[in-house]
C-alpha cells in the first residue's frame, strides 16, 4: 500500500477522547454466546514476558515441524472467591438489576473495597427464585485475592462475571452451587483455548502530537523556529473553533483496550516452574498458578487483566502447538 496523499494523523479517531480510564478494573461490555455452563471470564495479574519455542503445526507453513521462536506473556492466576449472585432483566433501556444475594461468609479484606452487607440484611436464595421468571441474565460477583501473590496489597479487585448456559434456570443453579467458594483458572479455561484480554494500558502521561498521533516532523524554517514538532495547521478561520479531529498534545496511555483471539499455551499450578532466575522485573516470583498466553498482553507488570472467552474467534484449524521450551533465564540482564 502506497503513501496516502493526505495523512493528517496515524491514530484512529474511534478511540477519542483519549483520556485516562476511570478505574484499573476494565469494563466488560460484551460476552460470548456460549451454551456451556460456567464462568465466561477470569481476572488475573500480569507477571511479565518471556519467550518460548513452539513446534509449528501448520502443514502449509515452510517451518512445519520445526521450532519457532515466539514471545509469550506469563499471568499469575490466584484463585477467586465468589461473593455474590446478581440477576438482570432485559428492558428497553438495557439491563436492569432485579436482586442480588451475598455469601454467608465474606472475606474481611473485601471490606477494604466495599461496604459489606450486614448479616441481618442479607437476602436468601429464595429472593433469586422469586424473580427467576423475569431474569434474562445471571452474573456472579467475584473478588481476587492479591494477598496470596507477591503484589504488596490486601485490597481485592471486584469483577462481575456472566455465567454461560442454555437456560436461566441452569445458570442460576450453577451460581448457587459455587456461591461462597473459590475457583481456579482450570475451572474456567483450558490449554489451547482462544481468549480475549481486557486491561488498562501503560500510562505515558502528557505527550506531544508527534508521539501521540504520529504526525510528520516539519523541517526547514519550522525547525529553525523551534516548532518542528508542532501541528502544522489546527484549522481554518471559520468555524471559529478547533475541531476535535485535530491531532493535538494530551494524555497518552492508561486507556482500556481489548485484544482479541489470544491462545492459551499452558496452564500450571506451580509458579516456581515458570518464574525466571531473579524473578520477573517489577513483579518478583509467581507464587500461585499461572497461565502462559501466546504474544503480548497490554499493561505493565502487576496490572489486573481479565481473560474472557473469545467473542469473535475464527475456526481453529490447527489446534494447540507443542511447546518445546519456555525460557526461565534471568530478565535482569545478568
From Swiss-Prot:
The gene is rpl3. Residues 1-20 are annotated as: Disordered. The keyword RNA-binding applies. This is Large ribosomal subunit protein uL3. Part of the 50S ribosomal subunit. Forms a cluster with proteins L14 and L24e. PROSITE patterns: RIBOSOMAL_L3. One of its GO terms (cellular component) is cytosolic large ribosomal subunit. Belongs to the universal ribosomal protein uL3 family. Keywords: Ribonucleoprotein, Ribosomal protein, RNA-binding, rRNA-binding. NCBIfam families: L3_arch, PRK04231.1. It comes from the Archaea. InterPro entries: L3_arc_euk (IPR045077), Ribosomal_L3_dom_3_arc_sf (IPR044892), Ribosomal_uL3 (IPR000597), Ribosomal_uL3_arc (IPR019928), Ribosomal_uL3_CS (IPR019926), Transl_B-barrel_sf (IPR009000). The keyword Membrane does not apply. One of the primary rRNA binding proteins, it binds directly near the 3'-end of the 23S rRNA, where it nucleates assembly of the 50S subunit. Residues 1-10 have a biased composition (Basic residues). One of its GO terms (molecular function) is structural constituent of ribosome. GO terms for biological process: translation.
